[in-house]
Amino acid sequence: TLTVLMYQVMKKLCKNRLVAFLLTLGAVYLLQDFIAARAQLVSYILFVLTILCIENFLVNKKKRYLIGLIAISIILANVHCAVWPFFFVLFLPYVAEYIIACIADMHILVKAQIIGSRIKIKFFKNEEKQKREETILQNKKQKLEKAKQATEKLRAHPFKIQVTKNKAVKWLILVMIICAFTGLLTPIGDTPYTYLIKTMQGNTMDSISEHLPLTLYDDKLTMFVFVMFLAILIFTDTKIQLSDLFMLGGITYMCFMSRRQVSLLIIICGFILAKLIAKLAEKYDRKEKKKMLEAMTTILGKLLTLALVMLISIVVFKPKAGQHFINSSAYPVEAADYILENLDVENMRIYNEYN
């Protein structure tokens, strides 16, 4: 489900089936250590749906996507409240881009100078000073118009970072406020609001592997992902949306704080990488993309594609084929068996610092 959903969302965002297909295969391979029969698997699917709803709403402004976001928030709070706060993190890059665009459109300094000139004209009694200030005022107004034109020109033809002022983001802010109260729609009280804070304040942050900081030297594949982003952004003239840049920077920071967030880097930032590669391919290799798509739709192309999918599946599955369902070296199996066989489970309380 996650793989199919990632491909469909990636294809919709980058508008390139070939790029979406190849990056989805790569993402599935990189996610092999994070896929387990845990609530996080459902969370990954919900995060992908969140990105899909946000992007679709910003494009077509249909309110049904806002309802979908509220539903996702309720499900997350009930299924995996530990990651529920991250649901709001996914909104922040879009909100930040909108705020920056609004501030840029204000031209605060020039407008402040215009207001200052008007105040001077009102209080000056000397006609000569008034005329001189009126001339300055007209110059400031012309400067304001030029500044507005320069801003529009820069947005139409940006150098590296694209900034879009989408008024639909106001609705996303409203949905964020509404969703902040959906944490109460659970049978566990205020736990969705306090669980993450209590976990981060506990001593497990220094002992549980997935909570430890990321070390790139020990994680070559994650290093390769970062290198791909840097190579495209530095050595090509491919432009990146400001919201995507914020998302990439924020999740990268989270990865270095805790290695468990690498999964979110692969999933969420995978969409950003797909858009960058699609732009790159569209600009430099449009004809080759068409040829490859035509080749993939032939019988031989379909067989090769199927073989590639099966090969990656075997590579992911083979190391785990001989493993027991429960790894006794990683989980306290004997302790759990002892508790079940010798203690009154229904009337006992076990202290677990992690929970």
Model-flagged regions — what are they?
Residues 56-74, 110, 170-174, 242-249:
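Short hydrophobic alpha-helices at membrane interfaces in multi-pass membrane enzymes
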Residues 38, 81-132, 136-139, 143, ...:
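Transmembrane catalytic cores of multi-pass membrane glycosyltransferases
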Residues 5-8, 27-30, 42-60, 91-103:
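Specific aromatic-rich, kink-prone transmembrane helix
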